Amino acid sequence: MANKREFPLERTRNIGIMAHIDAGKTTTTERILYYTGKIHKIGETHEGASQMDWMAQEQERGITITSAATTAAWKNHRINIIDTPGHVDFTIEVERSLRVLDGAVAVLDAQAGVEPQTETVWRQASDYDVPRIVFANKMDKLGADFDFSVQSIHDRLQANALPIQMPIGAEDDFQGIIDLVEMKADLYDVDELGTEWETVDVPDEYKEEAEKRRNEMIEQLADIDENIMEKYLGGEDISVAEIKAAIRKGTLALELFPVLAGSAFKNKGVQMMLDAVVDYLPSPLDVKPYSATDPETGDQVELIAGDDKSFAALAFKVATDPFVGRLTFIRVYQGTLESGSYVLNATKGKRERVGRLLQMHSNQRQEIPEVFSGDIAAAIGLKNTTTGDSLTDPAHPLQLESMVFPDPVIEVAVEPKSKADQDKMDIALQKLAEEDPSFRAETNPETGETVIAGMGELHLDIIVDRMKREFNVEATIGAPQVSYREAFTKKTSAQGKFVRQSGGKGQYGDVWVEFEPNEEGKGFEFEDAIVGGVVPREYIPSVEEGLREAMNNGVLAGYPLVDVKAKLYDGSYHDVDSSEAAFKVAASLALRAAAKTAAPVILEPIMKVEIRVPEEYMGDIMGQVTARRGRVDGMEAIAGAEEIHAFVPLSEMFGYATTLRSASQGRGTFTMTFDHYEAVPKSIQEEIIKKNGGHAE
């Protein structure tokens, strides 16, 4: 191996910064890059010039959309940072970054505590077993309250928050931070950019409170660490090293979550947070090994971090860069890879050549000769690789577990302003869909209309905006449409018989299929229960294919039919006239016939909506929820406001942002995420069928 790795694996940290929108996540990342020497000038998000928000729309909207990957060094450790979006439409970006991280920093707004989107990203991080530390940011803000933030972690996330610091002052009087582990205080010079601070003994007026809090911290650690428990009960001294070891052990085991205080905007506490990343978050060696499948034998294999193993990596993001073209971001789980070498895309079974390898710093890039185990880098030259694909050594193919992406819930028709733009628009949409698996673009073969689908209105706005900026395609978009589905609600059996025997080669296919509703989300399940060859083996795949194709067009209003179990149990064939095509048609006829007795319904996406408004607007807002066919699931008082939890059909939520803004004089906010599908009321079902020129039988 020609190149030597700069940082050993145990001194590598792959972390994400996750938060609710506006908690100060991008500013926090920005400061990390500033203090680790990657940025010379600090850019403020609210001035629209942040280092990490590298797409033009992100700078305009002041929100982070694309997870940019950045590398920094701190105290002889390499820290790879993935900046994740806080807006609910982009939870797919959060999911995909969590998949490749080892640890995360959850940023809270110290005045608001845990907010709805914090809960969403926290739940996603828990699904992937990602250890976290929490940074209570904006301690300088009016109403900032560190203890309230800690309590909100216990109450709203049911997580064992461990405060390892205590702020000195708050709001305008936020002067510094006491480290409860080392019992030292960091006091900041008000005028400096936070690069100037002094570490002193805990000031006398804070000693008693700090001692009390340190004791509480040790008591909490004793609950999960026997060594601390014994020493604590025996009244023995517990060293700083022992406390740090216990915090690290508890954090890695997801038994506790250290909480720190600071103000990224005022440059306070970021360095101590970086120390905590190094001290408490895992290296690639600390996380449980990822599993992969050997495609030849089907055996499960554990991926062990180490440069001496065969190369295995996951492509977790594809982005188009204006200067170098298509970038594929990869996380290396084991082995090394040199630029110019070949890899096998085990997902697609294709060999690809890696032209160059880049380490990304926000939107700057540095070419590197080789990537090592545990690294995150971007590869140029991979033409067939898309998000979620496994890249491995051609001599040792391995299939990593792919990522699961949600289906889009909202769609709009999009049309180029001029006919000349049609081809350009098709290319742009294809590239954008490659980058973002939660976005789809399809052309209706009958009407020629192009429809784009995504996770929310903002998601699609940004896609249209990117078409204009990056691909110079001007497009107009129609009104948003809901992605409805159809389902059977009763068990039934039906025959599908397709016979054509007049002149020339005939056609003959005959099937009996039993249909029943499947559990929500289980999809289509096909069972072959043919006995005695009444339908020959070679035609059975055609029956399944015929059913799948017919389900795509539904039975009521042309929406996909979902969650159906189909059992092929009888039928007949003709020695000469039967063919795969005939059985395919017969299967679709069986589905149509079944629709008459299976009581089909139209399903609509139901969103989980959380609305936060000052108390005086509660009545009006509750009325709005009910008027939108919503059902209120609960309410709670949070930080001087009321939060309403409700389930509302997506079709009723279009344009709600404007309604809420005017009803609450701009003081209300809401988030919504897709929750489940449920049947629409009968009257609405009839309207939908009528509107679609429905073909209910």
Swiss-Prot record:
**UniProt domain tr-type G: residue ranges:** 10-285
A GO biological process held by the record: ribosome disassembly
Q: What is its main location?
A: cytoplasm
| Alphabetized UniProt keyword annotations | Cytoplasm, Elongation factor, GTP-binding, Nucleotide-binding, Protein biosynthesis
Recorded GO CC terms: cytoplasm
Q: Name one Pfam family in it.
A: GTP_EFTU
Annotated GTP binding sites? 19-26, 83-87, 137-140
Nucleotide-binding: is it a keyword of this entry? yes
GO terms for MF? GTP binding; GTPase activity; translation elongation factor activity
User: Is this entry keyworded GTP-binding?
Assistant: yes
Q: Which InterPro entries match?
A: EFG_II, EFG_III, EFG_III/V, EFG_IV, EFG_V, EFG_V-like, EFTu-like_2, G_TR_CS
Q: Which domain of life is it from?
A: Bacteria
Which cellular compartments is it found in? Cytoplasm
Under the heading NCBIfam families, the entry gives: EF-G (TIGR00484), PRK12740.1-3 (NF009379), PRK12740.1-5 (NF009381), small_GTP (TIGR00231)
Against HAMAP family, the record matches this protein to: EF_G_EF_2_B
What does the UniProt function comment say about this protein? Catalyzes the GTP-dependent ribosomal translocation step during translation elongation. During this step, the ribosome changes from the pre-translocational (PRE) to the post-translocational (POST) state as the newly formed A-site-bound peptidyl-tRNA and P-site-bound deacylated tRNA move to the P and E sites, respectively. Catalyzes the coordinated movement of the two tRNA molecules, the mRNA and conformational changes in the ribosome.
What does the sequence similarity comment in the record state about its family? Belongs to the TRAFAC class translation factor GTPase superfamily. Classic translation factor GTPase family. EF-G/EF-2 subfamily.
Task: Identify this protein by name.
Answer: Elongation factor G
Species classification: Bacteria, Bacillati, Bacillota, Bacilli, Lactobacillales
